[in-house]
UniProtKB/Swiss-Prot annotation:
It comes from the Bacteria. InterPro entries: Ser_deHydtase-like_asu, UPF0597. Belongs to the UPF0597 family. The lineage of its organism: Bacteria, Pseudomonadati, Pseudomonadota, Gammaproteobacteria, Enterobacterales. Pfam families: SDH_alpha. This is UPF0597 protein YhaM. It comes from Escherichia coli O127:H6 (strain E2348/69 / EPEC).
Length: 436
């Protein structure tokens, strides 16, 4: 809980972070479907014998190629099956944290028996939509999630409606802290970070604890594309320098390797994404360690990073064709810049250079290769900080970057929200053709 004596705006900032920065086990799109299946199974009279599911095109895109923790398998069908047979309906984004070896075996058997189907919901106007219907004979239960990864809007069984709420608004519109955040500025966020009592934001240190553990796992195990471990080996071989820049990339990408490779450790997510949480956390942690920052300075830097990432992502669709590791890395750039010199000018220049650098990176679905994009974004963030420290940045005379950082952010988000919709459709079409 936060101090009720804080001014209302700061309270909303803290609430926004508490709502958007949460532990998540596994890639959050398959996990959203697993949660729907788990809640449906909890409502079903009798054991689950069959699972049917429907998801939005964007959720299908992000679920086709990612490993579900503990299963060694990729895709939405195993997520739906395991959610139904071994999920904890009360655990939110950690729905699979208690899944046993027996539950995993049962889920795989259900899949092998052809008792699990996942289809694209048609028509579907929602960007984030998942519906799971579980059966026991003629008895059934159905759960629908819309707008946010854990935002259950409808529960129904063969006996009738159990729960319903309005499902046509977005998660951002439902959450008053995010609505407040949409009306703020980076300068106001920086003032908050500089002046808020440490005790009120100490909780953000949990993001460092969780994501550092995931990073260590990525370096010690053969997860995903093992980018972090590979780059670390190249340092030992003398092909890559053992310096701060390398450490930022290695430790950040290692956490994503483990995350996307199916490690059974939670990530601290940001804006519904584990990779965004990793990207907003690990570069800041590495720089803080380099400068010997104490817990208070680390907490303030992490709060700036996570809150800036949320602030930018809040201007985007929940899922889009824009790789949001890039926007999370803009938050990381802010946090790292604050650690080095703390000036608003340095922070704003770093973010502007990020927008001029990696803003064209597409999201072609969740997969092991996300760690490549995470590593690229982390590297670009530190490069932008180094440029800003030398009073150098992409200027408002170039591309979509404006003279004002707030306008630069708005330009980027307008591009992702409108023009890149066709890009998203093309990506989904290409991925669907590969799956056939």
């Amino acid at each position: 809980m936060f101090d009720s004596t804080l001014n209302p705006l700061w309270q909303r900032y803290i609430l926004a972070v508490q709502e958007e920065v949460k532990p998540a086990l596994g890639c959050t799109e398959p996990i959203s479907l697993a949660l729907a299946a788990a809640v449906a199974a909890a409502e079903l009279e009798g054991p689950v014998e069959r699972v049917e599911a429907w998801v939005s095109p964007n959720l299908m895109k992000n679920g086709l190629g990612v490993t579900v923790p503990g299963t060694g398998m990729v895709g939405l069908p195993i997520a739906a099956a395991l959610g139904a047979l071994g999920g904890n309906a009360n655990a939110g984004l950690e729905v699979l944290k208690d899944a046993t070896a027996q539950a995993i075996a049962d889920a795989k058997a259900l899949l092998a028996a052809g008792k699990v189907s996942v289809k694209i919901q048609e028509p579907c106007d929602e960007i984030l939509f998942s519906r799971a219907k579980v059966w026991n004979g003629e008895k059934w239960a159905c759960v629908t999630i819309v707008g946010g990864h854990t935002n259950i809007v409808h529960i129904e069984t063969h006996n009738g409606v159990v729960f319903t709420q309005q499902a046509c608004v977005t998660e951002g519109e439902q959450e008053s802290p995010l609505t407040v955040l949409s009306r703020t500025t980076l300068a106001e966020i920086l003032k908050f970070v500089n002046e808020v009592p440490f005790a009120a934001i100490r909780f953000i240190l949990d993001s460092a604890k969780l994501n550092c553990a995931l990073s260590q796992e990525g370096l010690s195990g053969n997860w995903g594309l093992h980018i972090g471990a590979t780059l670390e080996k190249q340092c030992e071989r003398g092909l890559l320098a053992k310096d701060l820049s390398s450490s930022i990339v290695i430790r950040t990408s290692a956490a994503s390797d483990a995350r996307m490779g199916g490690a059974t450790l939670p990530a601290m997510s940001n804006s519904g994404s584990g990779n965004q949480g990793i990207t907003a956390t690990m570069p800041v942690v590495v720089v803080a360690e380099h400068f010997g920052a104490d817990d208070e300075r680390l907490a303030r830097a992490l709060m700036l990073s996570h809150l800036s990432a949320i602030y930018i992502h809040n201007q985007l669709p929940r899922l889009s064709a824009l790789c949001a590791a890039t926007t999370a890395a803009m938050g990381a750039a802010a946090g790292m810049a604050w650690l080095v010199d703390g000036r608003y000018e340095t922070i704003s220049m770093a973010i502007s250079s990020m927008i001029g650098d990696v803003s064209g990176m597409i999201c072609d679905g969740a997969s092991n290769s996300c760690a490549m994009k995470v590593s690229t974004s982390a590297s670009a963030a530190w490069k932008a900080v180094l440029m800003a420290l030398d009073d150098t940045a992409v200027t408002g005379n170039e591309g979509i970057v404006a003279h004002d950082v707030e306008q630069s952010i708005a330009n980027l988000c307008a591009l992702a929200s409108h023009s890149m919709q066709q890009t998203d459709r093309q990506i989904i079409e290409i991925m669907a053709s590969k799956a056939r």
